[in-house]
Amino acid sequence: PLPVVVVAYPITYDGHPDSYPLHIASKILSDGQSSRIYRKLVYDTGLALTAFGGGNIVEHPNLFYAVAIVQPGHTTEEVAQALIGEFERFRNEPVSDRELQQSKNQFARDYITSRETNQQKASHLAHAVVIHQDVRTADGEFDIFTGMTPADVQRVARTYFTPDTRLVMTILPKAGANRSVR
């Protein structure tokens, strides 16, 4: 086992106006190997074996988090500072038009593929009624997401990714955990 670093920030609930740009932020920061966090920590610096995260946007306020498994030869402090640095960069620099368009394309793909069966369609309708109290959001969210701007995304980053609310957690392997199992 290797050390793990988690950086997290409290965020709002699903259906809040800020939840939509937070979804976009999640795509840009932590959705896959082309995300900012993965590229920076795995490809560019080699600080982490892998890195991932996302916004846990549900019916109650929750967390936006990033997780990185520390590459041997590096410290948890280096990894924590790199993760924090990416959140700070996200707060201070607007996302590029290319990043925003890529995240919208990912959203459109997810939107379509998550509505292929009748059960999936019913689930989206139920979510709209129960969580949003408005059945129109089942389809109306598509227009909200495609209308996002870099300023919308940066505004929520500045609102939620603040040093005062940041949680940094380091998980260390138990002593002797690196021994081979026989």
Predicted region positions:
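M16 family metallopeptidases and their MPP-like homologs
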Residues: P1-Y13, R39-G147, R166-P173, R179-R182
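Bilobed periplasmic-binding protein-like "clamshell/Venus-flytrap" ligand-binding domains
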Residues: Q154-I171
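Charged alpha-helix within mobile-element recombinases
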Residues: T149-D152
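Generic solvent-exposed, charged/amphipathic alpha-helical segments
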Residues: A25-S26, Y38, I84, Q154, ...
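His/Glu-based metal-binding/catalytic segments typifying zinc-dependent metallopeptidases
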Residues: P1-S34
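Short beta-alpha junctions and helix-cap segments that line functional grooves
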Residues: I24, F52-G53, E141, R155-A157
